[in-house]
Swiss-Prot record:
GO molecular function, one term: nucleic acid binding
Pfam families to which the protein is assigned, alphabetical: UPF0102 (PF02021)
Taxon lineage: Bacteria, Pseudomonadati, Spirochaetota, Spirochaetia, Leptospirales
Gene3D superfamilies linked to this entry: 3.40.1350.10
Listed InterPro entries: Restrct_endonuc-II-like, tRNA_endonuc-like_dom_sf, UPF0102_YraN-like
Protein name according to UniProt: UPF0102 protein LBJ_1427
Family: Belongs to the UPF0102 family.
PANTHER family: UPF0102 PROTEIN YRAN
Length: 116
């Protein structure tokens, strides 16, 4: 990963974290890794655990970012979520939501909960 892409990714994750906090989420973990899988942000609100992918777009204003969630991405997120839950037994009885926080320099944050 290029240094520029890493900086943009970190910036996007900070913006997304602030956004999630503003709508009542508590951030539990950022950049959680399990085997070869990663979840950008894990948060909780009420009795729901949110596993969120963050996408930072500079262009593609008409692009629907939900299409980035192909089968392979869903599989990796599920695997990482299972790993997180196996390490955090007290959270296993919570509902789970897989989400996307899309950040566009022109549109701001768009939040897509319950993608799959």
């Amino acid at each position: 990963m290029s240094r520029f892409k890493k900086i943009k990714g970190d910036e996007g994750e900070s913006i997304a974290s602030d956004f999630l906090i503003s709508i009542g989420h508590e951030i539990l973990k950022r950049n959680y890794r399990f085997l070869y899988c990663e979840i950008d942000i894990i948060s909780i609100k009420e009795e729901v655990l949110y596993f969120s992918e963050v996408k930072f777009w500079k262009e593609f204003e008409s692009f629907d970012p939900r299409f980035t969630f192909n089968f392979a991405k869903q599989t990796r997120m599920r695997k990482a979520a299972s790993g997180f839950l196996s390490e955090n037994l007290s959270l296993q009885n919570h509902f789970v939501s897989f989400c996307l926080v899309s950040i566009n320099e022109k549109k701001g944050c768009e939040y897509y909960p319950d993608l799959f």
